[in-house]
Amino acid sequence: MARTVETVDGGNWREFIASPRAVLMIGKSDCPACGAWTEELNGFLGSDAKWTDVRFGKMVLDKGGLIEFKRANAWLADVEELPFNVLYERGERAKSWPGGGVERLVSRLENA
């Protein structure tokens, strides 16, 4: 079964980032670049065999229910460009970067 980007929201974000390795894409519903990155990432996950140990999720900031996430992650207030990606390793932020692109993602996974 092909993998796809998981939906991360106020009810599951703690469990998601606590995974051994997880990439969280943060966006908004009215962000064309966020939608394009989601499509590109889903295409990548559909054929990827190397990064099966990594969870990939998307959080949509304007969907509501994210007060706890926002309070626990004060750095979010400084994010100026969406989409914004965060690589978590066992609940800790290991890397973060703005924008999309599978090549950039793979580079960060390989160098984490």
Please state what every model-predicted region is.
Residues M1-A22, L105-A112:
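N-terminal leader/targeting and pre-domain segments
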Residues D9-N12, N42-G43, K70-N73:
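A generic local structural motif
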Residues V23-L24, N85:
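Hydrophobic beta-strand anchors of alpha/beta hydrolase catalytic cores
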Residues L24-G27, M59:
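Conserved beta-strand segments of the P-loop GTPase G domain that flank and frequently precede/overlap
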Residues G27-D30, E81:
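Short pre-active-site segment immediately N-terminal to redox-active cysteine/selenocysteine motifs
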Residues C31-C34, N85:
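The canonical Cys-X-X-Cys-His
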Residues G35-K50:
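Typically the conserved alpha-helix immediately C-terminal to a functionally engaged Cys/Sec
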Residues K50, V54-A112:
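Thioredoxin-like thiol-disulfide oxidoreductase module
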